């Protein structure tokens, strides 16, 4: 019997547990073999009894197979070639649970199968896994793999590492096995990070000598491709005369350099990287993002930091993304755990997952596809806690505490080891720490490796050519540390004293930006460049405004 006056009353009931219950029910049907109507068979003979509707809902491959006019549409058993039973079992379980375990051991086979069977979400998850584990020793193979399976993010990020770290990449075993076509592709990249003649000739020599009988014919083609100004008649004649001899690396090198025209030009500078200046401080917190190309000396402005009231944060770069972590607001000097992420390709900010520990004046670096936050201040005292953010798992994970908590220290990464140098320590940061702390992520362990010759805070450090360079601070002293020899050496002094400056490596040189000069009592706007070949500093430009405590990172163009 209808309620009077409420004929139009509607209650829309939505059961939020229904999708989960529905999937759980089908999972039970699958395990119990109920209502199954299709059997999948691996090459090994192992079979899986499934439901057509479930497979079609997860895979466009099966949807087309079961709906289009194909012979498989009417079959009760489908034989799938080229897929290991463990991989197929994982994909079938994913269809019934929405979960699948991806490991270093199975990821490539899983992506191949997901690509073939069009489990698009699984393929994307595998792609993100491979991006997370990209490094100099696998980026060439991953680039070819990405091209073959049409993985755009993996292709781009493997190319970013390949081009930005080419000097390290060509010294890997993987490089020696690449095809001529792949080598020509690499050499044709306009953003290949090479700035010296030998940096482009040496990999050609190395690759040719690895299989000299089959590759010597490619030598002239390779040299022509990279626009090295050689005498073609001399080189071809010399190669012809040497054909019967065993050509070693040294002989090939001698042939090439003898074939160079006496008046040849050095290779032209390439625009391989862009400097990003994030925020900073000039009598008050700055929120601007400034972008600089050192070759054109042109500045453009990016989207401002959304949280414009904070300062003394950590800034680091992972691929195209710039992470801004922690800091404090000037009105209460309370440490923040907030994270903002700037995408340099889209010029957009998004809020990231908060850190486990609030901190400011801490160190931020990237290692192994993750973002690390180390030490810093909390409640006015230096903290020992350290953590890293895994962008694939989307979570912050604590690591071993530092040996000594430090604030306003500097950190950088060399050969997969994190080095933290200097900073304040002790009660309320009353002392300056003179030790260098190193962190090995493989064993989750910190060590003390050496002492800094002039312990300071507010320094910057950068890795270059297997060494660490220490710049800035209250003096113009610049020092270089060789971890292999455990030796420090002093290099040419800077032109300015730069407390809390920024520093990056670009085009084979060190660029140091801004800072505060205690001797002059002023904020600095200038940019200094150090050329290690000349052991010389020079002023090469200016920031858009004077500043200190700013983020300064390099993003490689792809």
Swiss-Prot record:
InterPro entries for this protein: BACK, BTB-kelch_protein, BTB/POZ_dom, BTB_POZ_KLHL23, Kelch-typ_b-propeller, Kelch_1, KLHL23_BACK, SKP1/BTB/POZ_sf
Molecular functions (GO terms): ubiquitin-like ligase-substrate adaptor activity
GO cellular component, one term: cytoplasm
SUPFAM superfamilies: Kelch motif, POZ domain
UniProt keywords, alphabetically: Kelch repeat, Repeat
Record keyword Repeat present: yes
One BP annotation, GO: proteasome-mediated ubiquitin-dependent protein catabolic process
Repeat region (Kelch), residues: 274-320, 321-369, 370-416, 418-466, 467-508, 510-557
SMART domains for the chain: BACK, BTB, Kelch
Domain BACK: 139-240
Superkingdom per UniProt: Eukaryota
Name of one Pfam family that matches: BTB
Domain BTB as annotated: residue spans: 36-104
Protein name: Kelch-like protein 23
Annotated organism of origin: Homo sapiens (Human)
